[in-house]
Amino acid sequence: MQRDVFLRNLKRYCKARGLAFDFDPRHGKGGHGRVTVDGKFTTVQTELKPLHIQTILKQLGLPKDAV
């Protein structure tokens, strides 16, 4: 999955549940950026594999079916 698609779906999920969402592409090198959801943050790369998506959601404290 491409990062843009993942972030779009994650932003939609957060908005529907009233969670704060932010993405900052400046926090990271190359194709990496920082996504923050309700005070929890993690680094996201450009190309995401299914296992990496599950890890990101776990780090953000979100359920596996969030996106």
Predicted stretch roles:
Residues M1-K29, R34-V67:
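Basic nucleic-acid-binding interfaces
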